Amino acid sequence: MEESSVTIGTIDVSYLPNSSEYSLGRCKHTNEDWVDCGFKPTFFRSATLKWKESLMSRKRPFVGRCCYSCTPQSWERFFNPSIPSLGLRNVIYINETHTRHRGWLARRLSYILFVQERDVHKGMFATSITDNVLNSSRVQEAIAEVAAELNPDGSAQQQSKAIQKVKRKARKILQEMVATVSPGMIRLTGWVLLKLFNSFFWNIQIHKGQLEMVKAATETNLPLLFLPVHRSHIDYLLLTFILFCHNIKAPYIASGNNLNIPIFSTLIHKLGGFFIRRRLDETPDGRKDILYRALLHGHIVELLRQQQFLEIFLEGTRSRSGKTSCARAGLLSVVVDTLSSNTIPDILVIPVGISYDRIIEGHYNGEQLGKPKKNESLWSVARGVIRMLRKNYGYVRVDFAQPFSLKEYLEGQSQKPVSAPLSLEQALLPAILPSRPDAAAAEHEDMSSNESRNAADEAFRRRLIANLAEHILFTASKSCAIMSTHIVACLLLYRHRQGIHLSTLVEDFFVMKEEVLARDFDLGFSGNSEDVVMHAIQLLGNCVTITHTSRKDEFFITPSTTVPSVFELNFYSNGVLHVFIMEAIIACSIYAVQNKRGSGGSAGGLGNLISQEQLVRKAASLCYLLSNEGTISLPCQTFYQVCQETVGKFIQYGILTVAEQDDQEDVSPGLAEQQWNKKLPEPLNWRSDEEDEDSDFGEEQRDCYLKVSQAKEHQQFITFLQRLLGPLLEAYSSAAIFVHTFRGPVPESEYLQKLHRYLLTRTERNVAVYAESATYCLVKNAVKMFKDIGVFKETKQKRASVLELSTTFLPQGSRQKLLEYILSFVVL
């Protein structure tokens, strides 16, 4: 058998079937709608698959609807039944039909004519921001306070000089912070971006119905708050460009001061970007910089008061893992405070999902391998632009979620009878150390006691803002389209890690595409599956190896096993993780429950029977364990409720079946009568068939028992789901092993480096099952989780965080139980 192996980065196009026709996406669609390119099917495309694709392809779901439970009025607002049918369009496809002119010259100058006809003028944007902020009462108070600290015992004249000095400092800070939007620069940048985006993106897709909702929101004369996920530096320009193309004024963008570099900073200022410190506490003694905080607060308030649009990245920084990170709600709290003070009547919030076939940064392998982040510079920006012009990054999809009223959300939350949420320590320690009381089980028992709601109450305010941020990020993440590179990378890592024939990969790609659509997530691609798969393989570059087998005239696709390549594949694979995250949690929990029952010897003759109550509890505890990996569910739902719903889906799929009555009666009495420390909340209990409808619902209720299907396709799906969480659980379990050798106190940064080195060593020695378990993001998340559940105590010494073991986990036995708890979910 003759074989030749090449990486796709240097692939010989003669190896590709119908290479002359392999041009997926390179055509700029002449239709506004997203239509299939009419590619000729390649040889590995079977007639059966063609028939299945035409017959089974699902209608695209409309994503981004706001939460009906929290904002029922906004649910009906801006939306009508015709919006989902408006379809998609390619924003960067512009010709004379998008202008008022026709003819040969209009075709040649279509970009110039298009940007010239956009509605953007100086009157749209804020004026006199610096003076208004300096004259605000909060800033004046901060200036006086800082001046008093400079001259605590000074005379009136010295105090006046100190105030003038602080005012000059405040004005200088504002001059660096405040954006001066230039309509001319926006037009020029729009023209440049049309040229650039067409050179390194094949298209940028938006849903026309979503833009109609955004346009309707702009007509309310209320400030809009755009809150996108953060994947790439190009995010800053992308949103402004799309809004500009649709005659919607540019938002003011909160940018980190790491981008405050010569020339580039001027461009960002002219486009509406304003720079903020990445850390607000930058005084030499580590105290809060009250002057800077007051100026930033005043700046945001003034923009909102003048009905400007804002764009804030809740994650704070670009995601290095490919997953949506946890929220940092600092600036969002300023927005909430502004609304609470009745400065403005309302704010419309718009979560935004952004998906890339391939980010312009390519990957974050350097940082994931523990290398320090390189500071941005003018030279690095120039090199980045040159690099982008030499490559193509495929498709981009931007989804605008339905705008919702922030006022409605806040008022609704203030009236809900919700008790204070459990800390991770309260929720998880009883599961790790069973001798402790089970606080998680009593989570809902206090829900009937309605707390007094007062936005001035700091604890309630913090909880309210945190929940709002989680709500927004969950919606934005749910709105993110799944790209072809996400699915292909996921299949190669967690279904076919040893390699797979291209024809089989295409079949599995089609099946997974249908699974994604069935879960109401949209796709960022269209067309024949074999062409889309080849498109994804090309973009994944050196991460994938293609071997040509001349005997079968077939290709064999293998993921690269080098650590950087696996890290990169994992980054793109994580783009699809949120689609299956809850199902993966249930799959791992099924294993944990079965493994515990099998090793404990109490299963008796139960076979595959498992307790539904126990499964839901186990899954909920795993949700808590993984809560630092992103927003798993809406904050208006408990983990118990979400796990219960997901178990119901497994029953619908046929993966789990409710045991027959005779089988449930055969359950050993010791197991059937097992008492839990606390009852589950009402939605998670199951009535006995014999229980009288008028009986007290608080009495002990009968559990329900489930069977796990042994069908081959169901077992394969469970295995796939378990592998999705494999890297996370391996990282956490390895971190738990490393805790056994802890010698403290130790600076957190030093401990992170040691733990990361340990995980990388496991990978280099082929001890690790998943090489991607050694990413630096997982190291940080594992240590943060251990701090949250009380494994480590954290103290501050000279502005540095120092870790030491808590008294609870000083005994080796407690650390061993932590390890055993995490390992219970790990499928060996």
UniProtKB/Swiss-Prot annotation:
<feature type="modified residue" description="N6-acetyllysine">
    <location>
        <position position="784"/>
    </location>
</feature>
<dbReference type="GO" id="GO:0001817">
    <property type="term" value="P:regulation of cytokine production"/>
</dbReference>
<feature type="modified residue" description="Phosphoserine">
    <location>
        <position position="695"/>
    </location>
</feature>
<feature type="modified residue" description="Phosphoserine">
    <location>
        <position position="688"/>
    </location>
</feature>
<dbReference type="GO" id="GO:0070236">
    <property type="term" value="P:negative regulation of activation-induced cell death of T cells"/>
</dbReference>
<dbReference type="GO" id="GO:0051607">
    <property type="term" value="P:defense response to virus"/>
</dbReference>
<dbReference type="GO" id="GO:0032869">
    <property type="term" value="P:cellular response to insulin stimulus"/>
</dbReference>
<dbReference type="GO" id="GO:0009749">
    <property type="term" value="P:response to glucose"/>
</dbReference>
<dbReference type="GO" id="GO:0006650">
    <property type="term" value="P:glycerophospholipid metabolic process"/>
</dbReference>
<keyword id="KW-0597">Phosphoprotein</keyword>
<feature type="binding site">
    <location>
        <position position="328"/>
    </location>
    <ligand>
        <name>CoA</name>
    </ligand>
</feature>
<comment type="similarity">
    <text>Belongs to the GPAT/DAPAT family.</text>
</comment>
<feature type="topological domain" description="Cytoplasmic">
    <location>
        <begin position="119"/>
        <end position="828"/>
    </location>
</feature>
<feature type="binding site">
    <location>
        <position position="288"/>
    </location>
    <ligand>
        <name>CoA</name>
    </ligand>
</feature>
<keyword id="KW-0594">Phospholipid biosynthesis</keyword>
<feature type="topological domain" description="Cytoplasmic">
    <location>
        <begin position="1"/>
        <end position="87"/>
    </location>
</feature>
<dbReference type="GO" id="GO:0050798">
    <property type="term" value="P:activated T cell proliferation"/>
</dbReference>
<dbReference type="GO" id="GO:0046686">
    <property type="term" value="P:response to cadmium ion"/>
</dbReference>
<feature type="intramembrane region">
    <location>
        <begin position="88"/>
        <end position="118"/>
    </location>
</feature>
<feature type="binding site">
    <location>
        <position position="293"/>
    </location>
    <ligand>
        <name>CoA</name>
    </ligand>
</feature>
<feature type="region of interest" description="Important for mitochondrial localization">
    <location>
        <begin position="80"/>
        <end position="120"/>
    </location>
</feature>
<dbReference type="GO" id="GO:0004366">
    <property type="term" value="F:glycerol-3-phosphate O-acyltransferase activity"/>
</dbReference>
<dbReference type="GO" id="GO:0006637">
    <property type="term" value="P:acyl-CoA metabolic process"/>
</dbReference>
<comment type="pathway">
    <text>Phospholipid metabolism; CDP-diacylglycerol biosynthesis; CDP-diacylglycerol from sn-glycerol 3-phosphate: step 1/3.</text>
</comment>
<keyword id="KW-1208">Phospholipid metabolism</keyword>
<protein>
    <recommendedName>
        <fullName>Glycerol-3-phosphate acyltransferase 1, mitochondrial</fullName>
        <ecNumber>2.3.1.15</ecNumber>
    </recommendedName>
</protein>
<dbReference type="GO" id="GO:0031966">
    <property type="term" value="C:mitochondrial membrane"/>
</dbReference>
<dbReference type="GO" id="GO:0006631">
    <property type="term" value="P:fatty acid metabolic process"/>
</dbReference>
<feature type="binding site">
    <location>
        <position position="278"/>
    </location>
    <ligand>
        <name>CoA</name>
    </ligand>
</feature>
<dbReference type="GO" id="GO:0006655">
    <property type="term" value="P:phosphatidylglycerol biosynthetic process"/>
</dbReference>
<dbReference type="GO" id="GO:0006654">
    <property type="term" value="P:phosphatidic acid biosynthetic process"/>
</dbReference>
<keyword id="KW-0443">Lipid metabolism</keyword>
<dbReference type="GO" id="GO:0010867">
    <property type="term" value="P:positive regulation of triglyceride biosynthetic process"/>
</dbReference>
<keyword id="KW-0496">Mitochondrion</keyword>
<dbReference type="InterPro" id="IPR045520">
    <property type="entry name" value="GPAT/DHAPAT_C"/>
</dbReference>
<feature type="binding site">
    <location>
        <position position="462"/>
    </location>
    <ligand>
        <name>CoA</name>
    </ligand>
</feature>
<dbReference type="InterPro" id="IPR041728">
    <property type="entry name" value="GPAT/DHAPAT_LPLAT"/>
</dbReference>
<keyword id="KW-0472">Membrane</keyword>
<dbReference type="GO" id="GO:0031667">
    <property type="term" value="P:response to nutrient levels"/>
</dbReference>
<dbReference type="Pfam" id="PF19277">
    <property type="entry name" value="GPAT_C"/>
</dbReference>
<keyword id="KW-0012">Acyltransferase</keyword>
<dbReference type="GO" id="GO:0016024">
    <property type="term" value="P:CDP-diacylglycerol biosynthetic process"/>
</dbReference>
